[in-house]
Amino acid sequence: MISAAVEPHVDAFKPDNREPLTPDFATTGKAPGAQRQHNPNKRKILFVTSEIADLVKTGGLGDVSAALPRALAHLHDVRVLIPGYRQVMESDNPIHIVGELGGHAALPPCKIGRMDMADGLVIYVLICPELYQRDGTPYGANNGRDWPDNHIRFARLGLAAAEIAAGEGKIHWTPEVVHAHDWPAGLAPAYMHWRGLNTPTLFTIHNLAYQGVYSRGCSPELAIPEHAMQQEGMEFYGKLSFLKAGLAYSSHITTVSATYAREITTPEFGCGLDGFLASKAQQGLLGGIPNGIDESWDSATDKHLQHNFSINDWEGKARNTQEVRELFGLDDSEGPLFAVVSRLVYQKGLDLTLGVADYIVEQGGQIAIIGRGEPEEEQAMRELALRHPGRIGVRIGFNETDARRMFAGSDFLLMPSRYEPCGLSQMYAQRFGSLPVARNTGGLADTIECGVTGFLFNESTVESYREALSRAFYVYGKKDLLNAMRCLSMTQPFNWCQAVEPYARLYEDLVKQTQLSHY
């Protein structure tokens, strides 16, 4: 609604032992969104993102873009810039026009709207109907195909961030740090660099595999200077990459876990950018800060659950298990229930789950699968369920309530990801007493303690996966051990206060470094 080769040194940015930032936040883990206190030392931080869970979300990026600004609110004045998709423009939150931006090359003029959320978060909406107000997702049509003009759509987002940083648009607020997220925001640091702006920039990689690669011929319509098409710039194997632009021109780079920050400097995980990223790491310009999860992930109070439970009362857990069995058409069973809550794509290692499914069933287990993704993966899951009626159930699609009930009702969560920058599902599952069986990679390695809060396996092979599953079956047969592991997993500190201090220190360091460079 509108009204007018060498092991790189990667800094993990681990929280230090200084006094808590605010007593209530440190003890409760709650981001004091609406209770925004006056802090004369607040820095102005602009988040640039293609999605935010309040309004439009396709994955973990949307969750982080919604939660992290709120978690930082008591320390900094954090605002979010997002395209004015149809879902955004048609939300119940009023949008007030606060500024205008002119066109440049093929990037059209647009307006800037301001949306004030109930808890005080300010969202700037980039209003350009010809680019953003379409049916579908932020990235493509409902048929799954990317919009052919995505290079223009997200270049406009990056340019808008640079214009706001330059004080254009007359919104009467100028950021001291611009924090861009993933490839759709990758041109924000680049446009700022090309304009000679001194505002420091931070670029966060949520998934290196998505790189926003386009033809070099797009450069003129995006106003990309010729000198940028060099190896040290945004050139990527003869094409241009929005993600590499963010890496090349930002003041600092973070990923969403310390292990992933190390992994992406290697050929196995670097997606063709390992050498470039290893160089950044050796310069001290790459680090990992883990994501947190929202406080609503509490099995004792979650309103999505019909049967709440806690480490002192397991009855609700058993009732949730029965509910999930009924939802997926599974037989009554004394065996363990394994859950898959995932995008059905190659990255998630679902072919490995197909390879161990017979073993799980033979050992007396059941599998409930929910998700959507590639048509071939979806069909493979359907066929798997047909082979094992009453033992394996599949629901193609995604529903927040059903997902939460699966975490609450399952005994184990299957996450055989080939790579996992951070991962949220394993944290959700642990909070609800479902022990992850996961590959030892990325954020999974950082958030699961093998044999204590879950089970890890090293190789992307059926054999390695099966060995971890055998350990899970063993623990399931030892109820005292099972409940002890559940208790430990449910009390893990996965809230956002783990990320607030390192981000706050990093913003301050970036501002001070910029100030010192001008003395």
From Swiss-Prot:
Similarity-based family: Belongs to the glycosyltransferase 1 family. Bacterial/plant glycogen synthase subfamily.
Source taxonomy: Bacteria, Pseudomonadati, Pseudomonadota, Gammaproteobacteria, Pseudomonadales
EC primary class: transferase
Reaction equation(s) it catalyzes: [(1->4)-alpha-D-glucosyl](n) + ADP-alpha-D-glucose = [(1->4)-alpha-D-glucosyl](n+1) + ADP + H(+)
Keyword annotations from UniProtKB, A to Z: Glycogen biosynthesis, Glycosyltransferase, Transferase
Annotated binding of ADP-alpha-D-glucose, by residue: K57
EC number: 2.4.1.21
Protein name: Glycogen synthase
Any GO BP: glycogen biosynthetic process
GO molecular function, one term: alpha-1,4-glucan glucosyltransferase (UDP-glucose donor) activity
Cleavable signal peptide: none
Nucleotide-binding as UniProt keyword: no
Annotated segments matching region Disordered: 1-40
CDD domains associated with the record: GT5_Glycogen_synthase_DULL1-like
NCBIfam families per record: glgA, PRK00654.1-2, PRK00654.1-5
UniProt KW Transport keyword: no
Composition skew (Basic and acidic residues), residue ranges: 8-21
Natural source organism: Pseudomonas putida (strain ATCC 47054 / DSM 6125 / CFBP 8728 / NCIMB 11950 / KT2440)
